[in-house]
């Protein structure tokens, strides 16, 4: 009897233990399952986010391509001439989204060539060439010429460089690199693919000239360590590089010494005299003249320059050629003319003269006339009216985008500016 009772007691205790152990085991299992579920859900959510992010990275460029294709079907491009395969050239324009470069792009596209624009958008703007995006003959590449470029082309227009005083003084080292390393890279490309290269040089290589007007055989009167030297000397070195490659490597080069140019797509606050005067007159602010205003400049309209660049590229002239308008005016005359054309009540304000500001600049273009059959044809007032119209539209655009530009002086010395 005792043994049976004891057995039942032990059996009862074992059942209770088993139930307890089973309960603990079930609880532990449930806790483990819940923990794994929560962990897996977290991993899944993170994974889904990562996958979605990766998919978005892949899909976004495709969306952009689709938008460009849709635009190409609906967009009306400027009229383009048809050229045969033999006559159509593959042309590279460095700095092609800039002021002059974008007008050159228009000219070459409308002439029927295949144009590749390379720009790092330091001063260039996509807006300047967006009307060609999607066209089968056009390609836009975001690239800095200080890095090598590998592309098959027949001609290279090397325009890449900051060209207005505020821009090249803001980053003089970048300006030097663009005009030296960038030019070396483009010459190396021209050598590899057998292309002809045109360097957009500048009248600044003449410095503050002691000879007037300036012809191509004048060596200049320059300050190699002055505030503008990064640009002036950069272009002088670029010319030297071109002729070294021509003599040693047989590269075909053309060098255009470009004088003051104006027209639509100029930056309104780039610190140049024409853009400054137009912007000040439109905004009713004083037109700032540095010094007495007796300094002289000769301004050409941008379409004249573009025609000159194309004529030079397709010529047999390998020595430097001046491209500019020999019609000379004082800075004060420009201020008064722009004020009258705008119909502005702005006053003319005289400020202290800037350091290294050339007193006279006027091109001798006999060589261009004789060897290229080129000379400017757009009258000054006609060109200024076109520029003023563009600036009015640009001010409206900027106002709609909550940005009102102000004339931007070149920082030279104690806040002084210069006439470019």
UniProtKB/Swiss-Prot annotation:
Record organism:
Rattus norvegicus
For side Lumenal, which residue ranges? 41-420
Q: State the membrane topology.
A: Single-pass type II membrane protein
An annotated GO cellular component of this protein is: catalytic complex
- Which protein is depicted? UDP-glucuronic acid decarboxylase 1
Q: Tell me, what does this protein do in biology?
A: Catalyzes the NAD-dependent decarboxylation of UDP-glucuronic acid to UDP-xylose. Necessary for the biosynthesis of the core tetrasaccharide in glycosaminoglycan biosynthesis.
Using the record's annotations, give every residue carrying the modification Phosphothreonine. Answer: 94
Q: Which UniProt keywords apply?
A: Acetylation, Decarboxylase, Glycoprotein, Golgi apparatus, Lyase, Membrane, NAD, Phosphoprotein, Signal-anchor, Transmembrane, Transmembrane helix
- Going by the UniProt annotation, this protein carries glycans at 316
Q: Which InterPro entries match?
A: NAD(P)-bd_dom, NAD(P)-bd_dom_sf, UXS-like, UXS1_N
Tissue expression remark: Ubiquitous. Detected in heart, brain, spleen, lung, testis, liver, skeletal muscle and kidney.
């Amino acid at each position: 009897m005792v043994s049976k009772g004891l057995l039942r007691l032990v059996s009862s205790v074992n059942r209770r233990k088993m139930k307890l152990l089973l309960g603990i085991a079930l609880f532990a299992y449930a806790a483990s399952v819940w923990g794994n579920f929560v962990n897996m859900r977290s991993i899944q959510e993170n994974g889904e986010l990562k996958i979605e992010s990766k998919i978005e990275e892949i899909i976004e460029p495709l969306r952009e391509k689709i938008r460009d294709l849709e635009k190409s079907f609906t967009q009306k491009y400027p009229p383009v001439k048809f050229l045969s395969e033999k006559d159509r050239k593959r042309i590279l324009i460095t700095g092609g989204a800039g002021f002059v470069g974008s007008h050159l792009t228009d000219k070459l596209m409308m002439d029927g060539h295949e144009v590749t624009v390379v720009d790092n958008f330091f001063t260039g703007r996509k807006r300047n060439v967006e009307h060609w995006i999607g066209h089968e003959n056009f390609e836009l590449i975001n690239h800095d010429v200080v890095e090598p470029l590998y592309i098959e082309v027949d001609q290279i227009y090397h325009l890449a460089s900051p060209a207005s005083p505020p821009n090249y003084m803001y980053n003089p080292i970048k300006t030097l690199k663009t005009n030296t390393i960038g030019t070396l890279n483009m010459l190396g490309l021209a050598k590899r693919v057998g292309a002809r290269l045109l360097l957009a040089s500048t009248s600044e290589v003449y410095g503050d000239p002691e000879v007037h007007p300036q012809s191509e055989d004048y060596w200049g009167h320059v300050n190699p360590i002055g505030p503008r030297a990064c640009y002036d000397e950069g272009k002088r070195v670029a010319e030297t590089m071109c002729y070294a490659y021509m003599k040693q490597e047989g590269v075909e080069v053309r060098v255009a010494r470009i004088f003051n140019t104006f027209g639509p797509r100029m930056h309104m606050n780039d610190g140049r005299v024409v853009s400054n005067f137009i912007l000040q007159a439109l905004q009713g602010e004083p037109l700032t003249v540095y010094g007495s205003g007796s300094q002289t400049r000769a301004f050409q309209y941008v379409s004249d320059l573009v025609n000159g660049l194309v004529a030079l590229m397709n010529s047999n002239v390998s020595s430097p050629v001046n491209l500019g308008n020999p019609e000379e005016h004082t800075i004060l005359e420009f201020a008064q003319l722009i004020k009258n054309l705008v119909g502005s009540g702005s006053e003319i304000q005289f400020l202290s003269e800037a350091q290294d500001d050339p007193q006279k600049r006027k091109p001798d273009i006999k060589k261009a006339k004789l060897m290229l059959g080129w000379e400017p044809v757009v009258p000054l007032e006609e060109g200024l009216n076109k520029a003023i119209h563009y600036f009015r539209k640009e001010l409206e655009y900027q106002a709609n985008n909550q940005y009102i530009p102000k004339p931007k002086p070149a920082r030279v010395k104690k806040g002084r500016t210069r006439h470019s």
